[in-house]
């Protein structure tokens, strides 16, 4: 659970050969949940760091819980699976498995958090109106 208001800067899934999907989800203090990022075609030999654009970096209030969920494919249909007949547990070797997400965060003061939320709300309102201030159709 986040102790302070937070801006999520990036998300880098890390799994090994059987890794398939990884998702990071926020559970807000009011109970609402939201998927922040989901990588559906994880490639174990191409670990990508997904850096959020400034206007899209998730802003999370204090008390938010982050949940990382990972899916692995240990079937014979997975071309990256060295041996689908083997039970696989956690381990550091590439032929073992693991799942964790590397993320960077910036902790914000409550005032900075509220100001950034207000700035983004103003940007959204401006984008939803046309050049003359009338709504786009």
What are these model-predicted stretches?
Residues 133:
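Disulfide-stabilized, aromatic/cysteine-rich ligand-recognition loop
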Residues 1-127, 136-137:
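His-enriched metal-coordination microenvironments in redox/metal-binding proteins
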